[in-house]
Amino acid sequence: MANISYKHFTLGVEEEYMVLDPKTCELKSHDQKIVQEGQKIIKDKVKAEMHQAVVEVGTDICADVDEAFIDVATLRKTISSIAEDLDLWVGASGTHPFSHWESQMITEHVRYNEIVNELQEAARSNLIFGLHVHVGMETREMAIHIANSARYFLPHIYALSTNSPFWEGRKTGYKSFRTKVFDKFPRTGIPDFFESIEAYDNYVKLLIKTNRIDNAKKIWWDLRVHPFFNTVEFRVCDIPMTVQETITIAALFQAICAKLYKLRTQNLNFIIYPRNLVNENKWRASRYGIEGSMIDFGKESEVNTRVLIYELLDFVSDVVPHLGSQHYISHVHKILEQGTGADRQLKVYEETGSLPSVVKHIHENFLAGL
């Protein structure tokens, strides 16, 4: 059997941060001051988002997980330092625990104006913070096949990322309420199966032809073949509280892609499960995080979510050494033992009864371990 090259499984990581008022712990519309100052240092690696209380950063194309860690850590430290100079805080959580979207300003930009004009309150209320991970692909044809199979694992990784238990001052009962907010948008959630890249491209062409979208970036699925880069883009996760959690999740997505690629080169295929079944597990991940159970479709039974995540680690264990990501993958055990960002937010609230204390905890952990 020919040796498999893993070099094309590059990584790109995008994070969305909340901008905070240190005095009130509320979200703070900052008129893009952080972005303007950031672009003097890190150029286009920092960008404005639709709401002024959001800052988006993105890494370079990283050859491996070590590079991604260094890049994300540098971005977090840079943005945090700029914010501090402006008497602001930054933090990483899928939703803000108590700020209301109505009081936040929209960034003046043609693209955002178009989205708000079309989607109205669904867009204005979309005050959420996510993590996007790009994994490099050999070809677009391979990308669509890997995306089809990788859909099954989205709930597992989503459960590890859950970090948004509060919304507008209330405990939602969910470990991740962020996706419940985002579901108001069209073209979100688990994507359909596409038998080929041509089938996907034809779908995009139809939407453009019928004036639904102007380009494929307005397809906001939990996973998509990126319209401009040769990557599979994973978009399901909440922004994790810490850098270590972000890179652990990125390493898992990379390992899943590498394993599915390895199977395909051996003329083996992972089972393609229907979207409606994967959605069942996604809802469970949103509601319970790692504390609940998911459906094992093969056994047709409920299985503890932690057990399924351990099975995922076994599934990718043969490719992880080739990717050099063992250290980061091993952090999954710590998350499973100590809880996700949502679990930690809820613990602080139970101990203090104070949502501002939760925000302070989020801010204090933004640079944890760096």
PLM feature spans:
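Short, low-order "capping/linker" segments at domain edges
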Residues: 102-113, 173-186, 282
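Short, flexible active-site-proximal loops enriched in glycine and acidic residues
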Residues: 45-50, 83-96, 121-128
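C-terminal accessory/tail domains of diverse enzymes
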Residues: 1-86, 115, 182-370
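Internal, well-ordered domain-core segments that constitute the primary functional module
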Residues: 124-150
